[in-house]
Amino acid sequence: MAGELRGSRGPLQRIQIAPREAPNLHLTMGNWLVNHWLSVLFLVSWLGLNIFLFVYAFLNYEKSDKYYYTREILGTALALARASALCLNFNSMMILIPVCRNLLSFLRGTCSFCNRTLRKPLDHNLTFHKLVAYMICIFTVIHIIAHLFNFERYRRSQQAMDGSLASVLSSLSHPEKEDSWLNPIQSPNMTVMYAAFTSIAGLTGVIATVALVLMVTSAMEFIRRNYFELFWYTHHLFIVYIICLGIHGLGGIVRGQTEESLGESHPHNCSHSFHEWDDHKGSCRHPHFAGHPPESWKWILAPIAFYIFERILRFYRSQQKVVITKVVMHPSNVLELQMRKRGFSMEVGQYIFVNCPSISFLEWHPFTLTSAPEEEFFSVHIRAAGDWTRNLIRTFEQQHSPMPRIEVDGPFGTVSEDVFQYEVAVLVGAGIGVTPFASILKSIWYKFQRADNKLKTQKIYFYWICRETGAFAWFNNLLNSLEQEMEELGKMDFLNYRLFLTGWDSNIAGHAALNFDRATDILTGLKQKTSFGRPMWDNEFSRIATAHPKSAVGVFLCGPRTLAKSLRKRCQRYSSLDPRKVQFYFNKETF
């Protein structure tokens, strides 16, 4: 039954679908590379830098004469700990950049006239942020395990009574330099736990690791979607992580032989005669050691400066007065806020962060703008999807006077800004995910009213997938206005829209079938009839590719990950390797 209903032109009309040929894997991969080569190049460069830094540091600590005696105690674990530490510094430097929203918006604006491929990496900022976080976790595990081995070997060397080189090195001290030691465990009775929690490196390492674990676990999609407040507050532990990282190396636990000592007693000449180091008649003296200077702060200083400037700018913009001009409660528990703010300027598809101090002083939530740039106000539609949004809707439903104060930060750019750069645009919204396309469709309505000849887009396909009929209500007026405007201008072919209801039952379908001959849809009142089920995307993409054989088609989605995966595959499958023929470019809203 569902297979008969999906993608049907009428509510219960059976359609015959021709069997589809299996996709060509080489063609699909080729199309993917054509669309994402710059993102791939950036990702490969980042991975390559991680590999280079790890190998460089590993070989340095594994082969350098400076750490010859340190390796006598610690072995290869020394090189593993230091190599992973260098990569941790590098990735900790990188992780803040993708979340500097104002910097990314500036870069997007600067690249507005660039090729769409050059802008695409900016659209994956959060994906890159997550990848860097995963890399930090991997190197943290390597670093911790290596140092656990190191501390255990320090302890064993200190307790050893066999007269080996490691035991002699562990008991070394210099009468003129109190810090000229090599083994941080200074007493045979000192435990590994005591040494770890009483040293700067050990204590800051434990605190930074706990902060990292809490941030990563609270960022899981289930928690982020259902307990956003927990994710939001816990993620601010990055401040603790950064501070601990910056001072982690102050203790100088990892020590190497000083340059002066290397000149006097080179390990290649003196390591085999360590029993004669204290013999004044011999040529070898016992070596002197110094701690490795802290370097983490050098890596993170620049991104911290960027981020501090970002937060100052956010704070300044959030303090500007916001005037709420209209509040509308739509069906399906959707709140519309229309607002004004001095100096506010937006583009289609952008989003803002909203804060309501009476609910939470610290929580900022992102919402796509549903107004058009041509309107005198900016608006958002907010669906109850968590404690904060439910409290906000409840606050405005109570109709207190004066209205609660709202703070706004933004707007910030997204992939939807590029919609008018394509000859053909395919807009796909799921549920409240239709909001960025409200802005686009409103802007089109204004452009047609003003006879804007600069509009590059020649055709728009709009798909909206909803679970319940009430969700269509707030959008009906806009679609109805667009229908009338297109009809009056003789451009009915410009917009092709399809509404899909997934939460239907037999009563709704039967009622729709009985009234199928009506001029307007019984659910929405629009001329375009509502379809039941989900779109058959292969049919839709094949139809679009046939209708526009030489066009660049931008596919824009605001919806769940499963739908994104499906559409991304279709874009790759139905694009031609010949740049002169149809090309589908997939774009997904992420903020």
From Swiss-Prot:
Residues 317-418 form the FAD-binding FR-type domain. Its cofactor is FAD. Phosphorylation at Thr-457 mediated by PKC/PRKBC positively regulates its interaction with NOXA1 and enzyme activity. Residues 1-36, 98-130, 217-234, 445-591 are cytoplasmic. It is found in: Cell projection, Invadopodium membrane; Cell membrane. GO terms for cellular component: anchoring junction; cell projection; cytoplasm; early endosome; endosome; NADPH oxidase complex. Residues 424-563 are annotated as: Interaction with NOXO1. Its main location: membrane. SUPFAM superfamilies: Ferredoxin reductase-like, C-terminal NADP-linked domain, Riboflavin synthase domain-like. The keyword Cell membrane applies. GO terms for biological process: angiogenesis; cell migration; cellular response to hyperoxia; extracellular matrix organization; hydrogen peroxide metabolic process; intrinsic apoptotic signaling pathway in response to oxidative stress; JNK cascade; MAPK cascade. The modification Phosphothreonine is found at T457. Keywords: Cell junction, Cell membrane, Cell projection, Electron transport, FAD, Flavoprotein, Glycoprotein, Heme, Iron, Membrane, Metal-binding, NADP, Oxidoreductase, Phosphoprotein, Transmembrane, Transmembrane helix, Transport. It is a multi-pass membrane protein. Residues 82-316 form the Ferric oxidoreductase domain. One of its GO terms (molecular function) is superoxide-generating NAD(P)H oxidase activity. Residues 60-72, 152-195, 256-423 are extracellular. It comes from the Eukaryota. Its EC number is 1.6.3.-. Heme binds at H129, H143, H236, H248. NOX1, NOXA1, NOXO1, RAC1 and CYBA forms a functional multimeric complex supporting ROS production. Interacts with NOXO1. Interacts (via FAD-binding FR-type domain) with ARHGEF7 (via PH domain). Interacts with NOXA1. PANTHER family: NADPH OXIDASE (PTHR11972), NADPH OXIDASE 1 (PTHR11972:SF71). This is NADPH oxidase 1. The gene is Nox1.
